[in-house]
């Protein structure tokens, strides 16, 4: 396990986490069965609030409510627009203690087992894609470029940051 993941999980466990999170994260590994358990807990919470859970593309990190259940939730409300505004808050509240951190680390530890920073991953991808303009940039300069909303990157960047 990368030091980064151990350090981040230690910090998380030192904070106030749910019993499920403590159980799943204690050994610094998240199995498929543990992710399924976290998803089930999230789905129960959403169902208790009248929404059906949706996990997007199944990457372990995406969560929300199905469009059908959002439509039904809005239709059942006296104020459909207010109900629509409540859905992200409900989804986040249900994710807290269930899928939020467990899903994040499940995804991150598999897609980036070395625990490299996003900036390191971008630099490596951009350099291998032949994007010359970033070659001599410091990490700070690259971060500023990535954060600059007026910057129009070359097409190769899409493969790195999508």
Predicted feature residues:
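Mitochondrial intermembrane space
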Residues: 1-162
């Amino acid at each position: 396990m990368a030091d980064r993941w151990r350090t981040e999980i230690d910090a998380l466990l030192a904070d106030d986490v749910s019993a499920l999170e403590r159980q799943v994260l204690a050994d610094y590994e998240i199995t498929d069965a543990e992710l399924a358990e976290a998803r089930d807990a999230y789905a129960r919470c959403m169902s208790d609030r009248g929404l059906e859970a949706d996990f997007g593309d199944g990457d372990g990190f995406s969560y929300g409510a199905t469009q059908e259940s959002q439509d039904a939730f809005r239709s059942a409300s006296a104020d459909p627009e207010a109900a629509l505004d409540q859905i992200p808050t409900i989804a986040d509240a249900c994710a807290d203690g269930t899928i939020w951190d467990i899903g994040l680390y499940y995804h991150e530890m598999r897609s980036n087992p070395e625990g490299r920073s996003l900036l390191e991953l971008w630099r490596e991808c951009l350099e291998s894609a032949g994007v010359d303009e970033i070659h001599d940039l410091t990490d700070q300069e690259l971060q500023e470029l990535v954060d600059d909303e007026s910057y129009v990157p070359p097409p190769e960047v899409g493969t790195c940051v999508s």
